[in-house]
């Protein structure tokens, strides 16, 4: 039974439930309405714009590569005359998606100790050398063999065909969030670590246009840098670049004296050989950050876990740069700085998002695709100024007269909210119904309500 204060969390579906015959276990789930209350109208958007354009809407429509970039990519691929390009693209795509992080020495040692204990329990203790061979064989069989990718001219072209469009879509979605929530922010400088084909530069230029006057692209592969420069120049080594002010380097500048308004590492941290290397790079990138640090990886458990490590490293960093002592906070996607509830759940899930895009037009690339990715955007300054609305972390389920939303909330918990017009008001119901996976839901939680409003909400319905 619901008691007193808890009664406000109950929802009666009534005639809908009787007509459709919901199973008892699903009735209990549908009756739960976690801590969502009324629509947050501090920005006074109600009455000025339709609900489908509420300020939490952040999803982009299907992303398309800039025409100059798509044509340059086509020209380079047609001129390469590489055999079986479609098969090579598919093989590299599958490999990059299924790739794991390298196993750390400490974890390898822990596995060896467990294997040794298991083998010794069931074997003759005199055969020490044989036991060592068994342990090594078992480790080789069960341990992921991570290898560093070395991008030659040919592999760089395959990577471009496989990842240019999807990478552009993911980065465009991240930049769109910054622009939509802070339209007054006009960055002038950008640094891209692990720049690859230069998709970050193109996405930034598409988002902020002429406000950006300097792009620093850093990649250890000379072949990748050469390819990125050709793409900027229409597919040739000569000519004027389509995006001015782009500079290329093979090594990450470590001096904290020069900062960039936006620093990006897209699908790059997972290419580093160890956790120590990732720690050093993230700390350097944060020192180089003037306003926003954007980190993007595959939407897998490995990618999400890696990003949460980087997030915690920045938030818990003891060292403060004397040149920029401003603290960091999470701008997106988390509405809090607490441990990720997706990772601490009994069955951990990757916090990921999806962006539709049109691929480079080739015979095997005709239909729109979806890029599934994880991201974290860290910002310098005070989190009090940030919007702390709950984030929708799964596709919204629209049902007759109610909507299911899975939310990551400002208190650091996941909530499954069932929103109805009767219980939560027409405005919040309409906002929830037009929202999508990845959007923010503009709500005031019960804890944020003034005492008079809370008392009214606690009162039983007649």
Curated annotation (Swiss-Prot):
Annotated organism of origin: Bos taurus
Q: What does this protein do?
A: Mitochondrial ribosome (mitoribosome) assembly factor. Binds at the interface of the head and body domains of the mitochondrial small ribosomal subunit (mt-SSU), occluding the mRNA channel and preventing compaction of the head domain towards the body. Probable inactive methyltransferase: retains the characteristic folding and ability to bind S-adenosyl-L-methionine, but it probably lost its methyltransferase activity.
Looking up Gene3D superfamilies in the UniProt record yields: Vaccinia Virus protein VP39 (3.40.50.150)
The text of the family note is:
Belongs to the methyltransferase superfamily. Rsm22 family.
Predominant subcellular localization, coarse grouping: mitochondrion
Q: Which residues form a coiled coil?
A: none
**GO molecular function per UniProt:** 4 iron, 4 sulfur cluster binding; metal ion binding; methyltransferase activity; S-adenosyl-L-methionine binding; structural constituent of ribosome
- Subcellular localization(s) per the UniProt record: Mitochondrion matrix
Q: What is this protein called?
A: Ribosome assembly protein METTL17, mitochondrial
GO biological-process terms attached to the record: ribosomal small subunit biogenesis; translation
Q: Report quaternary structure and partners.
A: Associates with the mitochondrial ribosome (mitoribosome).
> Which lineage is the organism of this entry classified under, starting from the top rank?
Eukaryota, Metazoa, Chordata, Craniata, Vertebrata
- GO cellular component term of the entry, any: mitochondrial matrix
Q: Recite the UniProt keywords alphabetically.
A: 4Fe-4S, Iron, Iron-sulfur, Metal-binding, Mitochondrion, S-adenosyl-L-methionine, Transit peptide
- Transit peptide: give start and end: 1-31
**Domain-related comment:** [4Fe-4S] cluster-binding is essential for its ability to promote assembly of the mitochondrial ribosome (mitoribosome).
UniProt binding sites for [4Fe-4S] cluster:
334, 340, 351, 408
In terms of Pfam families, this protein maps to: Rsm22 (PF09243)
Source organism, top-level taxon? Eukaryota
In terms of PANTHER family, this protein maps to: 37S RIBOSOMAL PROTEIN S22, METHYLTRANSFERASE-LIKE PROTEIN 17, MITOCHONDRIAL
């Amino acid at each position: 039974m619901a008691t007193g204060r808890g009664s406000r969390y109950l929802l009666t579906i009534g005639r809908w439930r009787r007509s459709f015959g919901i199973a008892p276990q699903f009735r209990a789930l549908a009756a739960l309405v976690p801590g969502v209350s009324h629509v947050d109208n501090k920005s006074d958007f109600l009455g000025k714009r339709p609900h489908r354009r509420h300020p939490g809407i952040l999803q982009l429509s299907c992303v398309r590569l800039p025409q100059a970039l798509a044509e340059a990519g086509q020209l380079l691929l047609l001129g390469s005359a590489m055999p079986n390009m479609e098969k090579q693209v598919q093989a590299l795509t599958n490999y990059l998606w299924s790739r794991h992080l390298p196993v750390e020495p400490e974890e390898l040692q822990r596995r060896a100790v467990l294997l040794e204990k298991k083998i010794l329990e069931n074997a003759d203790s005199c055969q020490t050398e044989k036991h060592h061979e068994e342990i090594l064989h078992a480790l080789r069989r069960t341990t992921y063999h991570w290898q560093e990718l070395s991008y030659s001219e040919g592999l760089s072209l395959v990577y471009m065909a496989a990842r240019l469009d999807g990478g552009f879509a993911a980065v465009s979605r991240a930049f769109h969030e910054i622009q939509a929530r802070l339209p007054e922010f006009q960055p002038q400088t950008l640094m891209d670590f692990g720049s690859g084909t230069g998709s970050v530069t193109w996405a930034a230029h598409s988002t902020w246009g002429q406000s950006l006057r300097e792009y620093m692209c850093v990649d250890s592969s000379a072949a990748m840098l050469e390819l990125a420069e050709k793409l900027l120049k229409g597919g040739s080594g000569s000519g004027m670049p389509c995006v001015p002010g782009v500079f290329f380097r093979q090594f990450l500048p470590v001096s904290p004296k020069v900062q960039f308004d936006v620093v990006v590492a897209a699908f790059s941290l997972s290419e580093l050989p160890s956790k120590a290397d990732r720690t050093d790079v993230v700390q350097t990138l944060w020192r180089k950050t003037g306003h926003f640090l954007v980190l993007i990886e595959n939407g897998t458990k490995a990618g999400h876990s890696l990003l949460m490590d980087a997030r915690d490293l920045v938030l818990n960093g003891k060292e403060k740069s004397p040149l920029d002592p401003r603290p960091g906070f999470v701008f997106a996607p988390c509405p809090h700085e607490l441990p990720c509830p997706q990772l601490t759940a009994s069955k951990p899930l990757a916090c990921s998002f999806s962006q539709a895009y049109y691929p480079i037009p080739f015979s095997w690339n005709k239909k729109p695709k979806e890029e599934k990715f994880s991201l974290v955007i860290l910002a310098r300054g005070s989190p009090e100024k940030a919007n702390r609305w709950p984030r929708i972390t799964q596709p919204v389920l629209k049902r007759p007269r109610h909507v299911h939303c899975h939310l990551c909330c400002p208190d650091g918990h996941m909530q499954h909210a069932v929103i109805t017009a009767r219980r939560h008001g027409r405005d919040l119901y309409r906002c929830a119904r037009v929202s999508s996976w990845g959007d923010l839901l503009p709500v005031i939680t019960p804890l944020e309500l003034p005492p008079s409003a809370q008392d009214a909400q606690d009162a039983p319905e007649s």
